[in-house]
Amino acid sequence: MQQHYDYIIVGAGSAGCVLADRLSESGQHQVLLLEAGGSDKSIFIQMPTALSYPMNTEKYAWQFETVAEEGLDGRQLHCPRGKVLGGSSSINGMVYVRGHACDFDEWEAEGAKGWNYQACLPYFRKAETWTGGADEYRGGSGPVGTCNGNDMKLNPLYQAFIEAGKDAGYPETQDYNGYQQEGFGPMHMTVDKGVRASTSNAYLSRAKKRSNFTLMKGVTAHRILLEGKKAVGIEFEQSGEIKQCFANKEVVSSAGSIGSVQLLQLSGIGPKTVLDKAGIEVKHTLEGVGKNLQDHLEVYFQYHCKQPITLNSKLGLISKGLIGTEWILTRKGLGATNHFESCAFIRSREGLKSPNIQFHFLPAAMRYDGRAAFDGHGFQVHVGPNKPESRGSVEVVSANPNDKPKIEFNYISTEQDKQDWRDCIRLTREILNQPAMDAFRGEEIQPGLNITSDEAIGEWVKQNVESAYHPSCSCKMGSNDDPMAVLNEACQVRGIEGLRVVDSSIFPTIPNGNLNAPTIMVAERAADMILGNTLEQSNNTPVWIAPNWQETQRMRPPKRDLSSISSIA
């Protein structure tokens, strides 16, 4: 076995596959990619509609759980992370949301110098081929294919949801990944010609054709090998055998917001109290490793549908078989979409410059495991506040790499987070009770019309909220005078030579949207940094900000306000 490489990357996920491709592209560098999981060649991964299967299986995902979360009355939430080629991009819901421009300007304000929106935009474009074609926001020749599924053509509910948002006084946006995030419009997904556009399909497939690239699967990384304050390699286990490999240039951890923390701490890099408690020798004290953990939560707002047009009629075995057969033969139809084809981003209150609430609309009422929520037809909106104040932590509990770490998100632990949820429930109910939904909207199944007071909303949210599976920010970038910053603006671990982290853990703050798109962007930009390339930069590309955002929460008053809604339902 070859033991020496130029670059060693741990984790073939959303970021690791990008790095593997870009670092091996010139043919000048020997690149090794280590992955704990195995092949992604399964219809349950490749067919978009099957998205609920891989994230719930041991084969394709680390089945982590949180501790009993105090803010959720002691509930433990599921926290699956990809353990397969493509990582979480092979098990996620394929929703393509870059985030708001203000999110990246916020990163820079938090100390991640140079990570403002104008610096990030070229790398979003570089990664993408958008079916609508290239413009100053969207990419036209990148590895990741993005689209709007079936362009909302297969169900009238998608457009009805957008019209309801307009009825409620919110703007319409044609492209939330472009000039204007705020508003109601079509939703985009990482689906390329009907197939999941994971980073394995988009990037790793290219790297695997190169003689200077090596992929090793079924590998458990034990620790980063250090010589003093320099990273020189990785110790790992494969088929029960402990092995070592060495990096001439750099080691890069792309193991994700749980895995990268675990690897650093197992290597003796992290908070002294955590390492001492776990019985790990402290090699380098960095208090921020595993801190600042953030996530998105969501609830499902569900209604009966008065017309028999929803996907609830497609959940039987015969229907699934027909959908699967059409997809196998044509890569088209209901198999070629994640079914989230319309969406919205709104501000919950005046004084916010950019949105903090996200909606995914689904023309079905089901649970995340893919089973029906009730008999008959229904629809639902996945909704939650996307800019939480709550911060959590990841901590290893022992020196054994096979022991699951302690994950505590500290969900809904601030007064503002609680208020955001109250606003979220009330605003969502108001939107879904606008005239545009009258022809379709039946009884409100959940939360239920009795959930109206602050106390009732708070209790219902605690019992019904689920993770949107967006753990992030646990190895944040920051300035040298920030004692909790794990990385500098070049993704380098502070105080350790030859070691970087490149994945969603490096975000200083969680963006307003799903995490796959910004994670790919981060990896594209980090690849240029690692290779010493000149960083690309946009030139003041304009971004829509709501006029009078300081004084108004939305553009116009709703056609129906909340006080009149109880009489409609």
From Swiss-Prot:
Q: What is its EC number?
A: 1.1.99.1, 1.2.1.8
- Molecular function terms, GO-annotated: betaine-aldehyde dehydrogenase (NAD+) activity; choline dehydrogenase activity; flavin adenine dinucleotide binding
| Tree of life domain | Bacteria
Identify the residues that bind FAD.
6-35
Keyword annotations for this protein, in alphabetical order, are:
FAD, Flavoprotein, NAD, Oxidoreductase
One Gene Ontology BP term is:
glycine betaine biosynthetic process from choline
Catalytic reaction equation(s): choline + A = betaine aldehyde + AH2; betaine aldehyde + NAD(+) + H2O = glycine betaine + NADH + 2 H(+)
- The UniProt record lists the keyword Flavoprotein: yes
- What is the main EC category here? oxidoreductase
Q: Does the keyword NAD apply?
A: yes
Q: Where is the active site?
A: H470
Pfam families, per this entry?
GMC_oxred_C, GMC_oxred_N
Please give the cofactor(s) recorded in the UniProt entry for this protein: FAD
Q: Part of which pathway?
A: Amine and polyamine biosynthesis; betaine biosynthesis via choline pathway; betaine aldehyde from choline (cytochrome c reductase route): step 1/1
* Family indicated by similarity: Belongs to the GMC oxidoreductase family.
Main role?
A: Involved in the biosynthesis of the osmoprotectant glycine betaine. Catalyzes the oxidation of choline to betaine aldehyde and betaine aldehyde to glycine betaine at the same rate.
> Which protein, by its recorded name, is this?
Oxygen-dependent choline dehydrogenase
Q: Which organism is it from?
A: Vibrio campbellii (strain ATCC BAA-1116)
